[in-house]
Design a protein with these regions (language model features):
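Bacterial Sec-dependent N-terminal signal peptides
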Residues: 1-26
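Carbohydrate-active catalytic/glycan-binding domains of CAZyme proteins
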Residues: 2, 25-347
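Boundary/junction segments of secreted and surface-exposed precursor proteins
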Residues: 343-364, 451-459
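Short proline/glycine- and polar residue-rich coil/turn motifs
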Residues: 400-406, 505-514, 553
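Short, surface-exposed loop/turn segments at beta-strand-coil junctions that are enriched for proline
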Residues: 415-420, 521-526
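Asparagine-centered strand-capping/turn motif at beta-strand->loop junctions
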Residues: 474-479
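Intrinsically disordered, low-complexity Pro/Gly/Ser/Thr-rich segments with frequent PxxP/GP/PP motifs
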Residues: 496-525
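Terminal connector regions
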Residues: 522-554
């Protein structure tokens, strides 16, 4: 009896260990209560459309929850386990997916991913099937983009491949990074890139830091001193950033909670978080309602149209827990394609600033191929205004409509627009006459969308015959020249701001930098560490802040 009891106890312990090991890869995140009030079109997740494919089959690997599935969607086979990647359309008219993968029979199973290869794959269709044509080299988490000089760049963790031609020779090299006295959050991996209007690049790293390179290949400089992600509990990874004709977009995944968050920005540096899930398991749905119920969706990338709108999402997916994907088993991973609702093309016709007192707002909805705004829209369903309003079913309602060529001009009652001085992309939500969701963003005609971006490095204290001096490097990472500004170095003491030094910053050309030498006040002690705040002002407007710990004359 004693032996049987000990055996049962030991068996229970093993089962608990297995259970803990399995479920340590997931946890349930509680959603904010107000998310229950979000309307259709509020969440980024509402933009996912039915998957496309022609070959629906169960004669393939995978758990029952992903069978049958479109085996001609994305890329998959029985030899390789594929993971993340993104698509670029070539001058040959074909779609080129650069994805990573490893042999399914690898002894470590899915945990072979650190030794993955980068595959160059092609397809005649945006959704696939993609077929590998060659291996570029070693690497994980690839993302392809085109630098200012026209060269193609495939980023991988800890490196990059560069080529003059998608089908040409690829040369391996390294990026240069300048943290500019800032802490690098969670290392430099899982990078994602978005091209700015002047062909410079903004990059986000795994930890949520924002970096800028003036051409995509030269040194990346960190601008932020903290992550731009939502201020919530989350194990964040897999950020993806892109820019369209309206604004910048960023999605980041909480891999443990299996929920992603969606953010928007006017300049790619300062971000606002939109409510609702960006994606989570269950978004891979067929037109008939069948779900390819993949266990995890990671490494989101987007394919963009000529306006920069995201029209397709590509995910790395796996049918089980990663550590349960073993060699020569029935589990594996692939890269899938899911079409996205790109949103409508909107133009605000009023040039005066919109306030709470604005009586009417005129918005033009542009016709596109396959879309007639004059006949396809349920006009009475439209709501327009700040995202904070329309996402919850509020906002401006329609007064009148008029046709202009093939386009539709909608006049909204300005009441309840919710647009403040900080707004940069008002939103439209509504329905088509067949009940499908529609949405779109518009620019405000009175706002400057390309502005200087001044950023300071840590102050350097020195002694001279004139006393204590403080030198601060300031650089303009914007695409346009800056006007004169004020730099101030200070610290907090007992709730009060103690000013250490301040001085004027001259006008700077794009990417130009200068050293500002300041006379420091007798309010700091040599060798003592302070929580310093370096602030750049234009008049009373705060342009940027940099918080750091630093000793004086260390």
């Amino acid at each position: 009896f004693m032996e049987r009891s000990l055996f049962k106890f030991a068996l229970l312990g093993v089962m608990l260990l297995i259970s803990h090991s399995s479920f340590s890869q997931i946890t349930e995140r509680e959603r904010p209560a107000e998310w229950k009030q979000l309307v259709k079109g509020a969440r980024f997740m509402d933009r996912f459309l039915p998957m496309k494919g022609n070959v629906l089959s169960s004669d393939t690997w995978g758990a029952d929850c992903v069978l049958p599935r479109y085996v001609d969607n994305g890329i998959e086979d029985g030899i390789w386990s594929y993971w993340g990647g993104n698509i670029r359309k070539g001058e040959d008219g074909k779609y080129h997916l650069f994805a990573c993968g490893w042999l399914e029979c690898s002894p470590k199973g899915h945990m072979e991913w650190p030794n993955s290869y980068v595959f160059h794959t092609i397809s005649d269709n945006l959704t696939g099937p993609f077929k590998p044509i060659r291996i570029i080299g070693k690497g994980h988490n690839p993302e392809i983009f085109r630098a200012k000089n026209g060269q193609y760049v495939v980023y991988v963790i800890n490196g990059r491949y560069v080529s003059d031609d998608l089908n040409g020779k690829w040369e391996y090299g390294k990026f240069d990074f300048n943290a500019r006295d800032r802490r690098i959050i969670e290392g430099l991996s899982n990078l994602s890139f978005a091209q700015r209007e002047d062909s410079s690049y903004v990059m986000v790293c795994r930890g949520g830091g924002i970096w800028v390179s003036k051409d995509g290949l030269s040194e990346y400089n960190q601008l932020t001193d903290k992550r731009v992600y939502p201020d919530v509990d989350g194990r964040f990874e897999d950020p993806v950033i892109w820019r369209d004709h309206i604004q910048y977009h960023l999605i980041v995944n909480d891999w443990l909670g299996r929920i992603a968050f969606y953010l928007r920005s006017k300049d790619g540096v300062n971000w606002v978080v939109d409510p609702g899930e960006a994606y989570m398991p269950g978004v891979a749905v067929h037109a008939d309602g069948q779900v390819e119920d993949w266990f995890k969706y990671e490494r989101l990338k987007v394919y963009q149209d000529k306006y920069g709108r995201a029209i397709q999402a590509n995910f790395a997916v796996i049918d089980t827990l990663k550590n349960e994907d073993k060699p020569f088993d029935h589990h594996s991973s692939k890269n899938i394609s899911i079409p996205l609702n790109p949103g409508l093309l909107l133009t605000i016709l009023d040039e005066k600033p919109i306030t709470s007192g604005t009586k009417t707002i005129r918005v033009k909805i542009q016709a596109e191929e396959g879309f007639n705004p004059q006949t396809d829209i349920d006009v009475n369903s439209l709501r327009f205004g700040a995202s904070e309003e329309v996402n919850y079913g509020r906002g401006c309602q329609v007064l009148t409509t008029e046709n202009e060529g093939k386009d539709l001009i909608v006049t909204f009652n300005g009441k309840g627009n919710g647009i403040t001085k900080d707004e940069f992309a008002p939103k439209l939500i509504g329905k088509y006459k067949d009940g499908r969701m529609l949405y779109g963003y518009a620019r405000l005609p009175y706002i400057d969308y390309i502005e200087p971006i001044l950023s300071a490095c840590a102050p350097v204290f020195t002694k001279s015959g004139k006393g204590l001096e403080c030198k601060v490097e300031v650089q303009n990472f914007g695409q346009v020249g800056s006007k004169k500004a004020l730099v101030e170095v200070a610290y907090k003491k007992e709730g009060k701001t103690i000013k250490v030094a301040s001085g004027m910053v001259p006008a700077l050309k794009p990417y130009e930098k200068t050293d500002i030498l300041l006379s420091a006040k007798d309010v700091v002690e040599e060798g003592k560490e302070y929580d310093l705040i370096v602030t750049l002002y234009s008049g009373k407007k705060v342009l940027s802040t940099f918080n750091l710990k630093k000793k004086v004359l260390e």
